Structure formats: structure tokens, C-alpha cells
């Protein structure tokens, strides 16, 4: 089966079409802008899978309808998923713009005095606004000389932010969300909304009953040699934590081995269902070998599966991580309890950064006073205003231990193409696998347990659906914090000490939901959230605006908020603008 090609970035150099001197004098400068833009993007960006980003430049500069049509024909044949129009001069606004209604688009108008690039930018954006096809504006803060081919830092930042978000939009389009199971314990995010996926993300939902997973395991629809490899890998790398079950519920060695085997099989089969596996065709399972073209998935688990079979914690933790028995690889996106809306936040974070995502319960707000009362410890530093306990039953990506290191030796989570095997091993070494608590998981399983290192910048996100409004996005930038071991132990044992923990301190602004940490917890829209490495809230905001998903709370600096130019016509308050613009334009793929 032919592999689906990755989306490319189209670069559209536009020019003043007047011959006999004007166009001729601008050809080289205009095309050089296009080449410089392409060089920047190919050097600085990668797809989430790690592949190099490709740019496609129009064969000629575009002066009018004919050349715009020729450019569009080329782009259509090369899977261009987003476009950047560049020019140093006046051109003919509506005659030269990209008219594709669902393709993210930006225009860079060169800030120079010799030719009016800014005038074209304004004219073209006016045409976009009038036609209802929003576009992003890129205009350098400082005037450049006509022969200056450098890209200023502020222009570079906008080009990269637009391109990262645009590639995410293009990469999700046409893919599917694999809903493995149905609604888990009444969790609203697992009431999978097909219209949301189709209208806002351009995706399909593949609904599959959990009996399909059971069938694949029971009928050996998997690569048996790979299973042996996975078991050997687990035997070498898994450290096991204490069994906190009552003796009557503790499993013997043979039973524990069977639970481990099935847990690894679940990971293999869910992966095969998502992306396919040619090895299955070799054993006569051609239909199953194709997979479901899923870029993200969710597994219901509780309770219809977990009351009888091993839970999904081990499978989800391994799939969500950047490594397994096959070595370092791109992490998958698999949402616990089939919380599809948290899965979408995970998908956004992965597409923007190429990193693994940490799925967690937004479990407890600990005030400084409560911690001092319970432990005698007074919080300080990043944690001085209180912390949020992010913890789930063990499905968080093992990268979340933050045993990887950046160029300065700081703890972090890296894009998978930068992770060494040594760093993957360090994450495994920092993780214990604890037998699942019988009262919760009667079928057994193993929960991963790790503690996220402190001082690491994170962005916590969540998508919610509001009846009458549609989807909204929440964003909270902050840091992981490290507590003294005795303090952590006291707090952790008050919940479930066999699960992975991140102590999270959001950045406060003193306003609205970010007045204090309690207000952030109080305004969080659901029981789950996602941690993405870095302070990347601005990228999420740009991506959300492309999809027409308003942001209902964030603590990103206003100077970093970057949305289509037409948003400015929807009022003077930038967050109200976002709601009005998203309502006005409707979902990107209107259905």
C-alpha cells in the first residue's frame, strides 16, 4: 500500500505585473524572498514524525490570475497544505491571493521604503477579510534596505509559528481518531463527537468495539516474533514496585507473567490497529494489516474491559512514550479512558513539538497552607502560591520523568529525533511498574510510577465542548516543581502512590482564572489535562485560531498572541475578538 505523503509548505512570490521596467526590476528580489523563506523553514522545522519539511515554490512570480492559477495547479499536485505569500512591493491584491478556503495562509510584506510591500499586505488582507478567507499578517517591525536579504527575528518568529501550526492543521486533515471502545465511566470526553472531528479537524472517527482487541489477541493476529522481543525488553528494563493489594488479590509469578504478556500484546495490537502492520499480511491477515489510518486513538478500558482483563496502563504508557522494544521512535497519541478531547489536546501538542505528551488527571489543588498543615513544609520558589497534583493511573508517557537533557544539561522532554538510547534507558530506569490496585482494576495490570523532575517548563492544555458554543481550548503555562522527598511521600500516599506524579505550578498573572492557583483548578473544564514540554501556549493559540476553536483561558503574554488579521475587526478585546471571529467564520471544515 502506498505511503501517504506528508503535507508541504507552498511559497508564493507575488510581484507587480507591469512590464517595461517595473516587474523586471523586482523579479530577483521577490524570488529571493521566497527562497529565503523556504530555506528558513526547511532548516528550522520538522514534521512530528521527524521527517524534513519540504517547501514548494511557485515556478514564477505571481502577478495576476493566470500565474496564480498555474501556482495553484502545481501546489495541488504536490500536497501543499499551507501557503506563505511573500512580496517586497505593490501587487494586485485580490488577483494574486491564495483562495483555498481551508488551507492556512500567511502573507509577508517586506518592510522597505523603495517599494510598498506593506501596501500590498494591507490590500491583500482586506481582500481576504472581505471574502471570508482569513490570513495571517507578517510585517517586520523595522525598515530594511532593499538589498537586505536577511529575515528579521520578529518576522522569523511569526513565520515559524504560522508554519508549525499550519503543518499541524494539514497533518491532521484526512486522518482518523480510533475510538477503541465507548464511554468510560460517564466521562464526557469519551462521548466521541464525530461532528467535532469532521468539522473542526477534518478527521474521521473509526469506532471499534473492544472485542476487536480481544479477537486479535486470542486469534494471534500479531507478530509473534515481536512479542518475544517485547517480553525480553521488558525483562531487561522493567523494575517492579511494591504490590499494595491485599494478599488475597496478589498474583503469583505465573499469573503476573500472563498479565505482562497481555499488556504488551495490547500495545502491539492497538498500534497495529492505528497504523497497520505489513507483517500481518504475511500471516494471511491482509485486512487487519491495513490499520485504520489513525493519527490518534483512545482506549475505553474501564470498566467493561478492566473488570476482566489487564488494564491499558502499560500499553498506553509505552505507546505514548518515544521508545519501546524497537528503540527510539515517534510517540503515539493514545488517550486514557477514550477521552477523545484530551486526545485532541495531546495530538495538537505532539504535532506542534514532535514530543511525547503526558496525559494526567487534574487531581488536587494543594494550597501552601494545606501543605504546611499536613507536612510542616513551607512552599517556596515556583511553588510558593500552591501546586496542582497531576497524576493518573499509569498511562503517562515515560518521557514525563524528564530524564532527557537539553544542550545545557537541564531536564526536559525532547523531540524523538533528538533522544539517545541512553536517555530512553534513563527514563525506563526512573520508572517502576506497580501491580494495579484490585479494587480499581479487577483484571490486573501494571501502572507506571515515576516522579517528574522539577523546574521544567510545561504547557497544560485541554479541549472541551460546550453545547451551543462548540469546542474551546484551555491553556496554562507553568513549571514542574520538586518537593522534598518526605513531603512528596506524605502527599503522594494520600492518593495512590503507585501512579506517576507531576507537581505543577502554573504561572500567575493576577487576572481572571490566573489570579491564583486555586482559580486555575476551579476553572479547568474537565478532569483531565495534557502536559506539553515548553512554554508553547502561543503556538496552541495560533493553531486554535486556524481551526476556529476559541481559547477560553490562557496565561500567554499578549504580545505573543498571533491570530489571523481579520480577528482585529471583531472588537477591541483580543479574547472577545477570538470568540466572535470563530463564531463568524465557523469551523474550518464547515459541515
Swiss-Prot record:
Gene Ontology molecular function: arabinose isomerase activity; L-fucose isomerase activity; manganese ion binding
Location in the cell: Cytoplasm
Substrates-to-products reaction catalysed: L-fucose = L-fuculose
Cofactor(s) for this UniProt protein: Mn(2+)
GO biological process, any: L-fucose catabolic process
Active-site residues, Swiss-Prot/TrEMBL: 337, 361
Residue positions binding Mn(2+): 337, 361, 528
Protein's name in the database: L-fucose isomerase
Organism in which the protein naturally occurs: Escherichia coli (strain SE11)
Amino acid at each position: 500500500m502506498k505511503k501517504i505523503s506528508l503535507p508541504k509548505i507552498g511559497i508564493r512570490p507575488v510581484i507587480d505585473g507591469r512590464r517595461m521596467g517595473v516587474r523586471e526590476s523586482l523579479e530577483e528580489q521577490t524570488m529571493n524572498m521566497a527562497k529565503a523563506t523556504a530555506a528558513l523553514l526547511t532548516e528550522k522545522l520538522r514534521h512530528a514524525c521527524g521527517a524534513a519539511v519540504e517547501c514548494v515554490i511557485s515556478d514564477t512570480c505571481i502577478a495576476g490570475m493566470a500565474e496564480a492559477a498555474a501556482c495553484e495547479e502545481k501546489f495541488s499536485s504536490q500536497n501543499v497544505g499551507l501557503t506563505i505569500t511573500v512580496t517586497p512591493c505593490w501587487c494586485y491584491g485580490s488577483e494574486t491571493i491564495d483562495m483555498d478556503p481551508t488551507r492556512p495562509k500567511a502573507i509577508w510584506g517586506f518592510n522597505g521604503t523603495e517599494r510598498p510591500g506593506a501596501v500590498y499586505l494591507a490590500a491583500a488582507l482586506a481582500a481576504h477579510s472581505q471574502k471570508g478567507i482569513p490570513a495571517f499578517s507578517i510585517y517586520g517591525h523595522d525598515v530594511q534596505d532593499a538589498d537586505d536579504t536577511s529575515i528579521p527575528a520578529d518576522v522569523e518568529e511569526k513565520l515559524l509559528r504560522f508554519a508549525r501550526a499550519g503543518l499541524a492543521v494539514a497533518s491532521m486533515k484526512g486522518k482518523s481518531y480510533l475510538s477503541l471502545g465507548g464511554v468510560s465511566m460517564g466521562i464526557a470526553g469519551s462521548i466521541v463527537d464525530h461532528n467535532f472531528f469532521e468539522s473542526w479537524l477534518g478527521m474521521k472517527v473509526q469506532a471499534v468495539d473492544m472485542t476487536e482487541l480481544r479477537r486479535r489477541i486470542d486469534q494471534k493476529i500479531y507478530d509473534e516474533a515481536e512479542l518475544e522481543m517485547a517480553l525480553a525488553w521488558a525483562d531487561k528494563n522493567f523494575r517492579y514496585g511494591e504490590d499494595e493489594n491485599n494478599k488475597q488479590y496478589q498474583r503469583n509469578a505465573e499469573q503476573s507473567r500472563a498479565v505482562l504478556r497481555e499488556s504488551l500484546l495490547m500495545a502491539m495490537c492497538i498500534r497495529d490497529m492505528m497504523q497497520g502492520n505489513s507483517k500481518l499480511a504475511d500471516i494471511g491477515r491482509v485486512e487487519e494489516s491495513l490499520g485504520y489510518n489513525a493519527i490518534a486513538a483512545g482506549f475505553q478500558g474501564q470498566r467493561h474491559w478492566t473488570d476482566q482483563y489487564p488494564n491499558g496502563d502499560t500499553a498506553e504508557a509505552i505507546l505514548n512514550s518515544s521508545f519501546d522494544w524497537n528503540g527510539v521512535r515517534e510517540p503515539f497519541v493514545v488517550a486514557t479512558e477514550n477521552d477523545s478531547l484530551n486526545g485532541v489536546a495531546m495530538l495538537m501538542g505532539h504535532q506542534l513539538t514532535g514530543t511525547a505528551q503526558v496525559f494526567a488527571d487534574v487531581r488536587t489543588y494543594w494550597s501552601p497552607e494545606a501543605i504546611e498543615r499536613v507536612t510542616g513544609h513551607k512552599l517556596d520558589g515556583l511553588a510558593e502560591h500552591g501546586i496542582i497534583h497531576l497524576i493518573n493511573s499509569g498511562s503517562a508517557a515515560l518521557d514525563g520523568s524528564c530524564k532527557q537533557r537539553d544542550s545545557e544539561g537541564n531536564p526536559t522532554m525532547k523531540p524523538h529525533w533528538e533522544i539517545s538510547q541512553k536517555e530512553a534507558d534513563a527514563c525506563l530506569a526512573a520508572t517502576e511498574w506497580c501491580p494495579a490496585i484490585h479494587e480499581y482494576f479487577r483484571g490486573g495490570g501494571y501502572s507506571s510510577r515515576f516522579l517528574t523532575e522539577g523546574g521544567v517548563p510545561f504547557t497544560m492544555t485541554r479541549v472541551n465542548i460546550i453545547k451551543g458554543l462548540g469546542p474551546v481550548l484551555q491553556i496554562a503555562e507553568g513549571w514542574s516543581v520538586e518537593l522534598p522527598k518526605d513531603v512528596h511521600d506524605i502527599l503522594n500516599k494520600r492518593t495512590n502512590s503507585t501512579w506517576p506524579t507531576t507537581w505543577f505550578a502554573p504561572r500567575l498573572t493576577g487576572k481572571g482564572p490566573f489570579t491564583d492557583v486555586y482559580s486555575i483548578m476551579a476553572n479547568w473544564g474537565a478532569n483531565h489535562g495534557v502536559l506539553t514540554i515548553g512554554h508553547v501556549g502561543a503556538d496552541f493559540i495560533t493553531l486554535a485560531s486556524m481551526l476556529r476553536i476559541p481559547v477560553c483561558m490562557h496565561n500567554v503574554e499578549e504580545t505573543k498572541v498571533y491570530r489571523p488579521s481579520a480577528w482585529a475587526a471583531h472588537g477591541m478585546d483580543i479574547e472577545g475578538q477570538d470568540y466572535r471571529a470563530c463564531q463568524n467564520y465557523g469551523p474550518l471544515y464547515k459541515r
